[in-house]
Amino acid sequence: MASINTIVKRKQYLWLGIVVVGTASAIGGALYLSDVDMSGNGETVAEQEPVPDMTGVVDTTFDDKVRQHATTEMQVTAAQMQKQYEEIRRELDVLNKQRGDDQRRIEKLGQDNAALAEQVKALGANPVTATGEPVPQMPASPPGPEGEPQPGNTPVSFPPQGSVAVPPPTAFYPGNGVTPPPQVTYQSVPVPNRIQRKVFTRNEGKQGPSLPYIPSGSFAKAMLIEGADANASVTGNESTVPMQLRITGLVEMPNSKTYDATGCFVGLEAWGDVSSERAIVRTRNISCLKDGKTIDMPIKGHVSFRGKNGIKGEVVMRNGKILGWAWGAGFVDGIGQGMERASQPAVGLGATAAYGAGDVLKMGIGGGASKAAQTLSDYYIKRAEQYHPVIPIGAGNEVTVVFQDGFQLKTVEEMALERTQSRAEEDNPESPVPVPPSAESHLNGFNTDQMLKQLGNLNPQQFMSGSQGGGNDGK
């Protein structure tokens, strides 16, 4: 059997010969066509069109499919530019509206300040109390002993305070001989065995999730960075193989919303389907590094290729060579059995066959070869049963990852905080609401049920005036 190097060398020589023959044919044809044009009747040769610049075109033919693709790209670019223009226009409208509101608010504040300044000037000229009444004069003091003058009749001088207005008093001392009105206070009596209410206020300082929610059905363009040979056997979905892709486009969400997840990695698992000749790929987790935040969480989704679920491939069976060896071993087994039977001498009815040394040697060779070939054939069959069909999927394929179930993007820190909070709630279950101690002390340590049980053992006749116990006491 020729080595792989010899086979490759022959192929290279074959291709070299094909290239040389093709080049020579092209040169000869060009020379022939040039001679035919020069031997013409002097007709003017039409000016040939310049060779189109095919730089950037992937395919060798510029057909309708490429033109349609270019048109689609231009339409998508125009739609994106129109969307950005509309967003900028809305932002400018909002800013103009806010500017007008701020201007009106400033004017209103200026008017309020002017009105307050006028009120302050009016209060400085005529001070009044909080109820709008003028400030009362101080009452006259009672006459002192031995005819001393009353302090209230003596003029009192105060130092000048400048233009500072004196604030009105908030309360007045009651006059002589006036009794202040009584004050009534109310105090609630706690009732036992009642449900207590507790109001929980929302923590306004707590912020919501810092990352968006990806709704179900969202999708993004991606590229496979790790291929695999998907197991296409009957139990292939139980023995999946890992794969990985890199998101290369924006995540398209409902209502033309997008999220930039470019560069994120998505872990995959795949198995093969012989009927459709496709590798069925499912997502496992997503990992990103966005603005210094680490995202690593499980997700549910699948991968599609050219509009269909799964990635197209060719089913490969690698047990053909082993099956050929098993067939060869079976063939040798048949030859050995034939040699063994041919070496047996044929005798008539009732006669006894005599075996010679040559017959024994032939039977041994045929039987040994048959047994060895049969064992080798069984071994190759068992080896072939271990092989299963696979669907090879190479890296570099452009695919689309689809998120089947919606999920909330969370950082590693947020997920750790949630686990800590859930663990704390499990360790500290909510306890029942206790009865306040003031209620027991107010009812001498008994609640309503206990008091009814104690009173149920009393006889009401003991508290009547004509009872027997009362007559005995009178004696």
From Swiss-Prot:
Residue spans of biased composition, Pro residues class: 136-148
Keyword S-adenosyl-L-methionine applies: no
GO MF entries: ATP hydrolysis activity
Feature: compositional bias, Basic and acidic residues: 417-426
Composition skew (Polar residues), residue ranges: 444-466
Highest taxon of the lineage: Bacteria
Annotated region (Disordered), positions in chain: 126-180, 417-475
This protein's record includes keyword Disulfide bond: no
Keyword entries, A-Z: Conjugation, Plasmid
InterPro entries: T4SS_VirB10/TraB/TrbI (IPR005498)
Function as written in the Swiss-Prot or TrEMBL entry: Involved in F pilus assembly.
Protein family according to the UniProt entry: Belongs to the TraB family.
This protein's name: Protein TraB
Native organism taxonomy: Bacteria, Pseudomonadati, Pseudomonadota, Gammaproteobacteria, Enterobacterales
Gene: traB
